[in-house]
């Protein structure tokens, strides 16, 4: 069965356009709720429960109410947290012993977009099979349960305090952040009211940007996808480093004191190196098809195993669980540290990097300067139709020519975006000029076919 609604990271789109509408969200809440009720075999649980959180988009109020109505109509109790980071909902789902967690967010996208992400009772992103079951259930009519079986809704007023305490618990009590000046960029998003408290309570001097959400400014010229803002602030304030989150708090990039952007790949390497040095690394590291070749080489030089999986933190998680490893991530800043949390958490990942720097006795610059990334050029080609990239002779002929020129000192990756109507062309290698030319040639070949 072909997916109609779910992409690589939940459901996402423009508010007011299918499927990001109130009526669809009522149906979605009822569909998921009906599955939870059907799967509830614990007689002690009269009503399954879900935790619903959201980021700071103005549309979150409308969509939250619609989801809430759908779940209650299905006989499911609802816990409402208000604006909270995506990984906070994963944590609270476990802490409140709920059967699922729902986040209303479009992550790093601009405010007109919104969507949903779903977590299991274990605080993990749900497998493809569950999403397919939801897709099927969406085709069924809503049949509200009998009045005495309706669910109830409750606000969790101390959700921020619970999450702050949890995040701080992942940082060793023997360490602190005293003496560090840190610039935080909360992207006017879901971390705005929790992240500054966490880092300051651990001892850091914190300068905060992007902490004044108004419903419309999430990710607007701030956050992990706009690192120039925090780069300028880090240099201006002569800070030791900068930390930028995305709108829902599951991605992070950092800035060293000289203004260099440190992406998710490099941050994973820092964490893995410190764990290896302290004999605490479980197995190896999981990256994705987008992970820079320089990181793979650096891990190999440290005798740390490395495997690639599909793009998307859910696939990184699946591979980590299969192998029994604990560290993985994406260059975009999704970083999983399974010894601390069941999903990618930007705040916790940042704390693990800071812990690693303390253990290595290095600055962020010192910890990353010896592993410069290979030049990587990414071109997004907009498309309105699906293309069989693997079997398109014109495109594949160009790729073969490029790969022969790169030899074993570079690579090509061509894939459709899981969240946008685009085809992503990525080329990386040691020589920037050669890499840029190669990416442009492949992009032209793709454009000719769309």
Q: Could you tell me what each predicted segment is?
A:
Residues 241, 277-450:
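Phosphate-binding and adjacent anionic-ligand microenvironments
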